[in-house]
Structure formats: C-alpha cells, structure tokens
C-alpha cells in the first residue's frame, strides 16, 4: 500500500523530527505502558471520559516520562465516548471548550506545570476540522485562556487554518492507526477498513507521511499532508504494539521523536 523505505534510511534521515501523541486518561489501563513511546499526551477532561483524579494521575505519568501535557476536550457525551456529532450553538461551543480547559488549567496550576497543547476529541475534532466558523471559535477560546497553548489539528483542515489566521500556534496532525479518505478526512469508524491494526502497515504509513509528505487513501488516491505530530489512539486494541514498533522504526531512520 505504501512506498517501502527499508533501503533508503540514510537518504532521508537527516534533520527530520516528529511528535508522537496519544489520547490518554480515558480508562484504557495502558497509559503507563504507552508513555515511554510518545512525546505528547492528550488527556481527557471529563466530558467523554475521565475525571479530576484521572487527569492528575495522567499528568503525573506524563511528567515522569518528560511527555508534553495536553487537554483533550470533547462534546459532553460520556455515553457515546464523545464520538457522535452534536448540533450546538457557537456560544455553547465556546463554553464547552472553556469549561474543560479551565478545569484542566486549574489542575496543572495546582501541580506546578502548564498546558502545552489542546487537541479536540472524537466527533468534536472531526466536526471542527470540516467547519471554519467552529474552528475559529475554538481557536479564539484557547487563545483567550492562554495564547501560548498550541492547537493540534488535522493536517490541512479548518482547525489549522483558523488557528493560523488569529496567530495561535497550530501543529498539523496525521494518524498512525487510521486510514484516510480522498478528501483528507479520516475514514469513519463504522467502516471495516477505518482502523489500521498491523504495526508494520502503521509504521509504513507514518514513514510515507513524514518522508514523502503524502498518504495513499483507501481508494488509491495520493493526497498531500504536513506531518508535525502523529497520533496513536490509546483505545486502539493494538495501541502498545503500534507505538513500540513506530518508535523503533523512527529510531532506525534517525527521525527524532520530540514534542513541538
């Protein structure tokens, strides 16, 4: 499915780096096992999963592993793990984001650390990626809380464009464990081919995005991407195996793993 880079390590390895982020604090019980293989953690803020105690415990794990601490806000929808779209007013969207980040910031202040980034979760992430006005509200809300916070968003999406438009630092995200559609969006989870389960296939997809700035979609279309951070979902059934293999593969290619 992807170009093979096994024989071209020296050719492409100079000066490249990538962040590896993972969604955490969601009750999957694998956070401690994943931490050594990532550089950024997106921690659930209580609306789709988690609570103040899990936020604190996950922040502690991140600090122990020198991993960047990020807030992972979502729709208020624990029943569906934040994975169903909701139609809400823009003022409600601003409050939704503000309430979750403010809680997270209160905890980081208590623990003597700072929020490095925000990454939206699930349906909220996908909805904003496709909608300029929602993305603008999200970026403005984050900037009003702390202009030094970065926004992680889908590469090439409205989330990135609207953050850049107001001067909020954005980090373009790609995915190690998901397939793509020709429009640059992730394949919906209800489709059988949405998840990548083979660690080697996942690593090859990431290499294609980092080394070639492109990805082959499920229908064979090649699309351009800008890979600044790559996501591994903590609730993926093969998350630990994918993370370990990707970490080792990037090291073999001398691609530095570091937070933005």
Where are these regions (language model features)?
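Flexible, glycine/charged-enriched surface loops at secondary-structure junctions
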Residues: 108-116, 213-224, 256-260
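Glycine-rich tight-turn/loop motif centered on a GG-T
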Residues: 40-49, 80-94, 128-132, 145, ...
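C-terminal domain-boundary segment and adjacent tail
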Residues: 149, 241-260
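Conserved, mostly hydrophobic/aromatic
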Residues: 23, 72, 118, 232
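Acidic (Asp/Glu)-rich catalytic clusters
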Residues: 32-38, 57-70, 108-112
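Active-site rim beta-loop-alpha module in soluble metabolic enzymes
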Residues: 156-162, 166-214
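Glycine/small-residue-rich loop that forms an oxyanion/phosphate-binding "nest" at active or ligand-binding sites
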Residues: 78-117
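Active-site-adjacent beta->alpha loops and helix N-cap segments on the catalytic face
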Residues: 31, 50-63, 129-136, 156-163
